[in-house]
Amino acid sequence: MKLFDLTGRKAIVTGATRGLGRGMAEGLMEAGCEVVVVGSSASALSVAEEFRSKGFACHGLAVDLSEREQRRAGFAQAVELLGGHLDILVNGAGIQRRHFCEEFPIEDWDAVLEVNLTAAFDLCQMAGQQFIRQNSKGKIINIASMLSFFGGYTVPAYAASKGGVAQLTKALSNEWAGKNIQVNAIAPGYMATEMN
């Protein structure tokens, strides 16, 4: 008996070409889930091909999540690749910029908040709308951080964005629980990934 069986489920995982996002995408596929691997470059296509060569049901999609119209079109395309149905969204995409607080460029602040927080909300909203249209339960997993709860050094935008993700998750969870949409966040500690 499999304790974790997602056969027939369909998921979108952002930030899925490397690091934690890639590991989560692979874990979902190992449990039987069909996954759209979303990355910021064409590497998403080669990662999807690699997963397909292992026998997984996987699609790749290159989407610049910093561009609002592109991420909305990308979400629609991902749902289409999944046959018009979605069960799970994993918001794993994130970027990092490091500067001392007194020197932190506002352009870097905007870039980090756009990808880490605004895109996460936008994708949650689109997933929520999709779940409601389908009249089916849905799962959203946001990737927060230990920096959601304490500051850190030279990472004010990242800390602010991940604090926002933690609170956004609570707000969505409160509002959508009655619609059978479960919204949770995972707050990993420091990980030795390419981003860090």
Language model segments and positions:
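Alpha-helical segment proximal to the catalytic Tyr-Lys
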Residues: 129, 174-178
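Active-site helix of classical SDR
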Residues: 124, 161-164, 169
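Active-site loop immediately N-terminal to the catalytic Tyr-X3-Lys motif
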Residues: 102, 150-156, 178-179
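Substrate-binding pocket helix/loop in short-chain dehydrogenase/reductase
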Residues: 100-101, 105-113
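Residue(s) in the substrate-gating loop at a strand-loop-helix junction
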Residues: 145
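Conserved glycine-rich cofactor-binding loop
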Residues: 17-18
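Conserved glycine-rich Rossmann-like NAD(P)H-binding loop of the short-chain dehydrogenase/reductase
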Residues: 31-46
